[in-house]
Design a protein with these regions (language model features):
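Accessory RNA-recognition modules of RNA-modification enzymes
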Residues: 1-311
Length: 311
């Protein structure tokens, strides 16, 4: 399916979304919701695993919401994504199968199954009266506490554990007011930034920067202050606590310097494939003017600027 569940059908033809199952599995499942047009079930036992099921390198697959397809082979993941796109074009776009065949090209992907993410975000939760950091679970009401993530850049294997340990230690004696924590890492520039998202107000700046520096050796530590209701917060200020105050990444023959709130693709190699595809399609010339109507941090703007007269 488009989400995290496997899809089955009951004897009456009703669709059943099965949590914890992948396509090709034979499972025993418990029905947890019986709606008018569909049902939801939870896997209780895998009777016969799918040929596409793998043993993931992360023990939290199926619990943590960060890698819901982590127990599915890479080949099967790519095939499922292509099929989802084709299905969407036919069902919603009303394209014919022949038109879809013409539109959809083979997926171009990186070679990395794991260890490719340049960013990870953590949410705070309270465990036994103390603040703990973790990731959103498959159940969005729960936070899964972890000290490593195989999806995160493998050149920084201790970064997550070091940052989590430092902030857990600090929370024992300081009210940090953490709303979330972002960690960005680049294997190309060796940059490592820790961004602490908090409300405005007092904050133990020197203690936080010192403890994080000793634990994780980041190149940048910043505090991102936000205002407003939780669901509609806006950034009011980014405060540099230590280091460079920004994160750098080499991409597509250039270097980008990004502030913590700025959006950037979490897969640098994947972003380079996107840039390459856009440049191939546009074929920009030296005397042409390009307009980037939704430029963001400049992922496409900067490569265009190296090829066009003006952007």
């Amino acid at each position: 399916t488009y989400g995290t569940d496997g899809l089955a059908h009951a004897d009456n033809g009703k669709a059943v979304f099965v949590q914890g199952a992948v396509a090709g599995d034979t499972v025993e499942a418990e029905v947890v919701q019986d709606g008018k047009s569909f049902m939801r079930a939870r896997t209780t036992e895998i009777l016969e695993p799918s040929p596409d099921r793998i043993q993931p390198p992360c023990p939290f697959v199926g619990i943590c919401g960060g890698c819901s397809w982590g127990n599915l082979s890479r080949t099967a993941q790519l095939a499922a994504k292509e099929q989802n796109l084709r299905s969407t074009l036919e069902r919603i776009g009303k394209f014919s199968p022949d038109q879809v065949d013409e539109l959809v090209q083979p997926i171009r992907h990186t070679k990395d199954d794991w260890g490719y993410r340049n960013k990870i975000e953590l949410e705070p939760t309270v465990v036994n009266g103390r603040v703990r950091l973790g990731m959103h679970g498959v159940d969005p009401r729960k936070i899964v506490t972890v000290d490593s993530c195989p999806l995160f850049d493998k050149r920084f294997p201790k970064a997550l554990k070091s940052v989590v340990g430092a902030l857990n230690y600090l929370s024992g004696s300081h009210d940090l007011g953490l709303e979330r924590v972002g960690i960005r890492a680049s294997r190309r520039t060796k940059a490592l930034e820790v961004a602490l998202w908090t409300p405005t107000g007092s904050f133990p700046r020197s203690q936080v920067s010192r403890v994080l520096a000793d634990a994780a050796h980041p190149t940048s530590v910043v505090r991102v202050m936000s205002k407003g209701e939780k669901k509609a917060r806006r950034v009011s200020k980014v405060e540099m606590l230590a280091g460079e105050g920004s994160w750098t990444e080499n991409i597509a023959e250039g270097q980008m310097r990004l502030s913590a709130p700025s959006f950037f693709q979490v897969n640098t190699k994947g972003a380079e494939i996107l840039i390459e595809l856009v440049m191939e399609a546009l074929d920009p010339q030296e005397d042409e003017l390009a307009v980037d109507l939704y430029c963001g941090a400049g992922t496409f703007t900067l490569p265009l600027a190296r090829r066009c007269d003006f952007v």
